[in-house]
Amino acid sequence: MKKFFAFTASLLCLSCMLFAEDYQDLLKEPVSNEIETIIPEDQHVTNKTAKVRLEYTPLTDEVRLYYTCHAVSFDQGEAMNTALAVLKDFQDAHDEYFGYKYMRRDSVKYYKDEKTGFKWAMYQSYVRFTR
């Protein structure tokens, strides 16, 4: 009976050592689930009224890109080229990402600013980066 308990205790100790959690994972900072709003330094725009804004969620590796300009001067081809260039810059800035895939089809929305009365166009792109 003593041999059985000794064998069971040694087996338990051995299994605890084999399946122990690595302490380096515990020392890492937890990933934030908040949305970071990023305004890129290099906007890659040719339209003077255009602005680019990114919303980045580090927990899910998702980025929402918003390209906004006057509706009169909106060109979807330029918006797509700007989005590709800004996403490439974002990928280069974050070394852990090697590519991305589109989560939803890109969309264009038109709206009117109540203060100024201008009509604006917003091009939206929603992507998830892969590690």
Model-derived segments and spans:
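Sec-dependent N-terminal signal peptides
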Residues: 4-14
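Secreted/extracellular ectodomain signature
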Residues: 21-131
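Sec/Tat signal peptide C-region and signal peptidase I cleavage site
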Residues: 16-20
